[in-house]
């Protein structure tokens, strides 16, 4: 039993000391400092180059006010997908 008490006292004496500013009670800093400080994102000082726009030819003269029939809509979607397939290399 005495050996156990001696070991406990030695381990308590070897423990890191508590800074005086943090001792006693709980301050708001101790309660709310749960998360690491936020780091602002790094933005380069110059704009990054943009990818060139690829013109997608429409298979027919397109009027934005015109109502598309289902066949014209499928033809338009197929044309756009074919253009993208060639661009993506699939």
Curated annotation (Swiss-Prot):
Q: What is the lineage of its organism?
A: Eukaryota, Metazoa, Chordata, Craniata, Vertebrata
Q: What is this protein called?
A: Secretory calcium-binding phosphoprotein proline-glutamine-rich 1
Q: What does this protein do?
A: Tooth-associated epithelia protein that may participate in structuring the basal lamina at cell-tooth interface.
Q: In which tissues is it expressed?
A: Expressed in enamel organ.
The keyword Iron belongs to this UniProt entry's keyword annotation: no
* Compartments where located: Secreted
Signal peptide (UniProt feature, chain positions): 1-15
Q: Which gene encodes it?
A: Scpppq1
Keywords (alphabetical) are: Secreted, Signal
The Gene Ontology CC terms held by the record are: extracellular region
């Amino acid at each position: 039993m005495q050996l156990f008490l001696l070991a406990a006292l030695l381990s308590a004496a070897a423990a890191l000391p508590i800074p005086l500013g943090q001792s006693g009670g709980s301050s708001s800093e101790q309660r709310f400092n749960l998360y690491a400080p936020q780091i602002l994102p790094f933005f380069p000082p110059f704009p990054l180059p943009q990818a060139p726009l690829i013109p997608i030819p429409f298979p027919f003269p397109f009027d934005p006010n015109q109502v598309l029939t289902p066949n014209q809509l499928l033809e338009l979607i197929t044309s756009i997908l074919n253009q993208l397939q060639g661009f993506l290399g699939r």
